[in-house]
């Protein structure tokens, strides 16, 4: 039995799609030195190669892929988008505007200089910025621009071609820039990180090990009674002195949860909760030969929960003002926009921040009710909310505007992005609404992106050989310029106009480029996760601005003559 693989793939779009995805994901695991190719590049390369052999895919699959991707980007950005935009993000907003705006203007200038069409120019901008949202926004606006079908087909092919030719250039150049640009300026990144840490009281030990609190029980002897000197628990401030707090007391066989007015007496049995190192540092009067093992006394359910900041009495307050330890709770992590932040008493809490807190289940529940809610650990996605907001996004995208003889629509990309932001924002404020497990969100986002990249490559593959010969050298130059010059402009603006701390500035620059690999290099250079504060500040805004840049470049292009 003979099987013609080419005919088999051409006759089955679904089979072709998953063959491209599987081969591309395998290729993406390869490394060039310390740089991994990545899934996007792997799928793009494989799809380009198969596209050269005249394999093609249904455009509906491509459209669905980018719709899912851009919607999920909005859902991720939603919890912090409005707080950054309206309150704390003036510097971060300005940095993102400078980065995206300068890249847009440079791309427009180079496109006119080299005589390219809008497809090549927008594709070059998207690839150089390693930004799929630019590609998505430009492609969607082109489809709704009302230009002739033959011109539209050529522009969309060139859009994919420009992106394919410059993506790797943009990625590698930014990674190299992230490694060497900090060394070209006069301030050491590690020193800058330490400086901001001292100013804000940050915990600079980013690699500290996080332990869960444990419970141990001790019998009160004469030494401990003498140590307390008749003071009640509130006056003693045991947590401040030992790092542990008294959760339970057994007195005369009666088990009770003490309040601040309780005074320790001879023969009491007390249950102390604290980190292992805090137990090890206890004064000998607590533990020398007096530890007890009592099932009832030690029967406590220590839990670790992720608490989402929501309530108005917590939003805008500093972490220290929550006084978690006074309520018998221990803070393990602070997460903002999927980025782990330094545990900093002076960090101002934003709506949607996630605090990982450990302690007795009842105490954790109490503190969660006070500052927000416990993140739902269900693995069930609220598909109704997902579908409803997806529909809303598509309806927003149908809105069109007419200017003289030129019409353009908001487009599916911008509409879905806005709808996703609203879903993410509402989810951060309403615990029972719109829940999407992070794993499910990542899977849908990644799958949508990979489907889109496969469609882009198969569409552009047939013309890539001619494109390389005609504009390959120009694309190389333009890709480097658009990738690096906006970074330099952004650095100069942040350093000398905004006068930002360099560790925060470099983190914010990488956030404005939405490039996680480059962010890791900056953190390694600073030997701190302080730059993550800046990265989180610009990342959500930049995702939105980059999508709008893809739309704007198509709208502006006809007016340049």
Curated annotation (Swiss-Prot):
One of its GO terms (cellular component) is plasma membrane. It is a multi-pass membrane protein. GO terms for biological process: potassium ion transport. The chain crosses the membrane at residues 8-28, 32-52, 66-86, 94-114, 158-178, 383-403, 406-426, 447-467, 475-495, 540-560. It is found in: Cell membrane. It holds the Pfam family Asp-Al_Ex. One of its GO terms (molecular function) is monoatomic cation transmembrane transporter activity. NCBIfam families: PRK04972.1, YidE_YbjL_dupl. This is Putative transport protein YbjL. Belongs to the AAE transporter (TC 2.A.81) family. YbjL subfamily. It comes from Salmonella typhi. InterPro entries: AAE_transporter, RCK_C, RCK_C_sf, Transp_YbjL_put, YidE_YbjL. Residues 200-288, 292-373 form the RCK C-terminal domain. Keywords: Cell membrane, Membrane, Repeat, Transmembrane, Transmembrane helix, Transport. The keyword Oxidoreductase does not apply. PROSITE patterns: RCK_C. It comes from the Bacteria.
């Amino acid at each position: 039995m003979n099987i013609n693989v080419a005919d088999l793939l051409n006759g089955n779009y679904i089979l072709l799609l998953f063959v491209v995805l599987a081969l591309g994901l395998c290729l993406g695991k390869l490394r060039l030195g310390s740089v991994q190719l990545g899934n996007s590049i792997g799928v793009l390369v494989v799809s380009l190669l198969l596209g050269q052999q005249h394999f093609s895919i249904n455009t509906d699959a491509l459209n669905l892929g980018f719709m899912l991707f851009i919607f999920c980007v909005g859902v991720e950005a939603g919890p912090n988008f409005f707080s950054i935009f309206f309150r704390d993000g003036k510097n971060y907003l300005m940095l993102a505007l400078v980065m995206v705006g300068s890249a847009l203007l440079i791309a427009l200038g180079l496109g006119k200089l080299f005589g390219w069409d809008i497809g090549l120019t927008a594709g070059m901008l998207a690839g150089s910025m390693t930004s799929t949202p630019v590609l998505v926004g430009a492609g969607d606006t082109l489809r709704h621009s009302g230009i002739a079908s033959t011109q539209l087909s050529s522009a969309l092919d060139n859009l994919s071609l420009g992106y394919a030719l410059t993506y790797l250039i943009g990625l590698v150049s930014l990674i190299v820039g992230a490694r060497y640009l900090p060394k070209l300026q006069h301030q050491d990144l590690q020193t800058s990180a330490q400086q901001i840490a001292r100013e804000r009281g940050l915990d600079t030990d980013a690699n500290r090990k996080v332990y869960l609190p444990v419970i141990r029980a001790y019998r009160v002897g004469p030494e401990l009674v003498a140590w307390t000197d008749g003071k009640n628990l509130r006056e003693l401030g045991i947590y401040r002195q030992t790092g542990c707090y008294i959760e339970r007391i057994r007195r005369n066989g009666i088990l009770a949860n003490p309040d601040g007015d309780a005074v320790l007496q001879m023969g009491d049995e007390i249950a102390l909760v604290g980190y292992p190192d805090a137990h090890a540092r206890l004064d000998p009067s607590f533990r020398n030969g007096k530890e007890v093992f009592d099932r009832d006394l030690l029967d406590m359910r220590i839990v670790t929960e992720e608490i989402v900041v929501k309530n108005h009495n917590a939003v805008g307050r500093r972490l220290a003002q929550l006084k978690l330890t006074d309520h018998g709770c221990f803070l393990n992590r602070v997460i903002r926009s999927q980025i782990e932040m330094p545990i900093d008493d002076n960090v101002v809490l934003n709506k949607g921040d996630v605090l990982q807190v450990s302690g007795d289940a009842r105490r954790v529940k109490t503190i969660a009710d006070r500052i927000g809610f416990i993140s739902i650990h269900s693995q069930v996605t609220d598909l109704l909310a997902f579908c409803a907001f997806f529909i809303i996004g598509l309806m927003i995208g149908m809105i069109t505007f007419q200017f003289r003889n030129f019409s353009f629509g908001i487009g599916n990309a911008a509409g879905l992005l806005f709808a996703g932001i609203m879903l993410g924002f509402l989810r951060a404020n309403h615990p029972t609404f719109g829940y999407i497990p992070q794993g499910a969100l990542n899977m849908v986002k990644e799958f949508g992106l990979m489907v889109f990249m496969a469609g882009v490559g198969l569409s552009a593959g047939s013309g890539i050989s001619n494109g390389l010969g005609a504009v390959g050298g120009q694309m190389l130059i333009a890709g480097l310029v658009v990738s690096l010059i906006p970074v330099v402009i952004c650095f100069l603006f942040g350093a000398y106009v905004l006068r930002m701390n360099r560790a925060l500035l470099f983190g914010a620059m990488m956030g404005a480029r939405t490039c996680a690999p480059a962010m890791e290099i900056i953190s390694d250079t600073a030997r701190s996760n302080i730059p993550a504060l800046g990265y989180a500040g610009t990342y959500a805004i930049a995702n939105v601005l980059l999508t709008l840049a893809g739309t704007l470049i198509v709208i502006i292009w006809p007016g340049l003559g």
